[in-house]
Amino acid sequence: MMLPSSGVSVWLAAGASDMRRGMNGLALQVQQALGRDPHGGDVFVFRGKRGDLVKVLWHDGLGISLYAKRLERGRFIWPTPTDGAVCITWAQLGYMLEGIDWRNPQRTWRPASAG
């Protein structure tokens, strides 16, 4: 379970990433494309070309965790730069993973009620 401390930075890898990559491939992308240490304790978030899938990479000091989430409807809001990284807060990451625009927190899609 991901429970980083409050001092952990969350980095969005701008642009589209290859979602076929696993832990090692994404850690290499953190080093080469972002110029950061994937084992430094920060959280790194990657989005696929279609925009409906993100992968979250985090090293907790003991090992690397990889979390993936695909939206059933809609797309994850992503920064406009095509390269580099954008730092967001832990709360903004929570909004993003819930399908909410982290720049202006309002629900972007609500499932239809059952019944």
Predicted features and spans:
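Polybasic/polar functional segments that serve as interface/processing modules
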Residues: M1-G115
